[in-house]
Amino acid sequence: MDLGDNELTLTPIPGKSGKAYMGSYPDGKRIFVKMNTSPILPGLAREQIAPQLLWSRRLADGRDMCAQEWLTGKILTPYDMNRKQIVNILTRLHRSRPLMTQLSRLGYAMETPVDLLQSWQETAPDALRKNHFISEVMADLRQTIPGFREDHATIVHGDVRHSNWIETDSGLIYLVDWD
């Protein structure tokens, strides 16, 4: 891959997206590199929700490449998910007006509760949609759905399972995988 930076070597990191790399410099310094990541990554790093963004550049083929600090630590386990730091990070994410403003400027549309129910109805597997219990729950949700207020809208990650959290050796925790 031509990065325009002869010193940086990229090694793929196994994962679902196929867009994550460990970048290595000749002096041994490592960085985390992701192709075509979320455009709100700089804001997430400013809010200390995601690791620090070091740089971003557009490649000749039009793809975007972002570099973040390399974190030494561990992926959280299901048992770790009840920690207060997790609650604090999610609270910061959900209450961040600057991130909401940034998403709005980037053209992201808000999804209302009605939108989410409709999306589920259209994309859920037939076996789930035809399940009697789930059908009753969906009917109840449709009847009791709350009103939507844009001023109360929040950002959500969408996949906060334990494997999307990293704890550094110094004890800091970050939410990752913003695809």
Mark where each language-model region is.
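Juxta-kinase regulatory segment immediately upstream of eukaryotic protein kinase catalytic domains
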Residues: 1-11
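Short, well-ordered coil/turn elements that cap or connect secondary structure elements
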Residues: 3-5, 45-48, 150, 170
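Intrinsic-disorder/low-complexity loop/linker signature
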Residues: 5-6, 28, 62, 170
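A structural micro-motif
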Residues: 8, 51, 171-173
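ATP-binding pocket architecture of kinase catalytic cores
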Residues: 11-105
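Active-site acidic catalytic loop and adjacent metal/ATP-binding pocket
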Residues: 19-23, 142-179
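A cross-family kinase active-site recognition segment
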Residues: 74-135, 146, 150-153
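Short proline/glycine- and basic residue-enriched helix-capping loop/turn segments at helix->loop/beta transitions
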Residues: 137-141
